[in-house]
Amino acid sequence: MKFDLLKKDTDTRARAATLTTDHGVIETPIFMPVGTVGTVKGVHQRELKNDINPDVILANTYHLFLRPQIDILEKAGGLHKFMNWDRNILTDSGGYQVYSLSANRKIKEEGVKFKSHIDGTMHTFTPENVMEIQRSIGADIIMAFDECTPYPCDYNYAKRSMHMTHRWLDRCINHLEKTPLKYEHSQAFFPIVQGSTYKDLRRQSAEYIANAGAIGNAIGGLSVGEPAEEMYAMTDVVCELLPEDKPRYLMGVGTPINILENIALGIDMFDCVMPTRNARNGMLFTAYGSINIKNQKWKDDFSPIDEMGITFVDTEYSKAYLKHLFSVNELLGKQIATIHNLGFYLWLTRQARKHILAGDFGTWKAMMVKQMDNRL
């Protein structure tokens, strides 16, 4: 993978760059739609590629390990071929999903023993087998195995967990070097900064991760319930220490405003289930604020869903029609809302890139944050 830093904003730490992999160019800042089990929920690959048009999507190691299982993916020739996707894929390591199981997992130095949420069977993830699983999935960007701590988190626990994540990172790197590629494209490996909401721990972790010398770096353990200001403070501390000449990925973030604020702090890559999950519940994001399409006020509003027309659904359907689809629990309503929200998120990060390159990102961001902080 090759990272080219094209321009840095003069008023903030925002950057415009490109990542080049064997599956194409990723223009940053970028939002990555979440395709947990090998699909972005409710979206055909044709719509995803032609209308939403992301350079990269995310898939989940934990879920793909359980279903369809790794032998099926290997027989298919990897996830790209299995899901008929010829652009970039990033896989997370399963650390966050294991964290979210809480009552059904046991964390030890060796790894994590957990109970499947599907059938109750017991499995173990270690730094070594997670690297092997991600080789078999075949994503372009793969993540280190880490422990994601909850919020709030006791300082001593956060410190012990961070050091274990660092030891796991060393094991990931050692094993990855011994594990050959399974397919005809290369894979880039990103370690993950942890440390909960403690600045000293975040600094320690960022220094350790920076010294690992990986091709890119990620920040984990945020967007787990902490206030936005704490998230920004941790991102700020970490971005001061991570190398400028490598991409920075903030995992699991966030709202449109979160994304713009973190771009200003120096983040290049984002993923989050919010645009798809909220869409399925009738919440739409727009440049002028959010819309709860289930509200009665939209029942006779025949204006387009979004007059900006970012994706085809925005001008083909009215708010009244979409409200009707949700009222009768029609699946099409969830699909329309999902395409709209993902299209908006991709538009937002592309606009951020455009304004970084133009040199007026700070002014544009301030306007957009104020404009989007609104319920329509």
Predicted regions and their residues:
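C-terminal extensions of enzymes
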Residues: 1-20, 26-32, 41-42, 146-153, ...
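Conserved, mostly hydrophobic/aromatic
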Residues: 24, 57, 92, 134, ...
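Short, solvent-exposed loop/turn segments at secondary-structure junctions
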Residues: 33, 63-65, 96-97, 149-150, ...
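A non-catalytic, amphipathic alpha-helix used as a structural packing/dimerization or gating element
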Residues: 129, 133, 137, 160, ...
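Structural signal for hydrophobic packing residues in well-ordered secondary-structure cores
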Residues: 138, 169, 173-176, 180, ...
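Glycine- and acidic
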Residues: 151-155, 159, 216-222, 331-334
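Glycine-rich phosphate/ribose-binding loops and adjacent secondary-structure elements
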Residues: 175, 179, 184-305
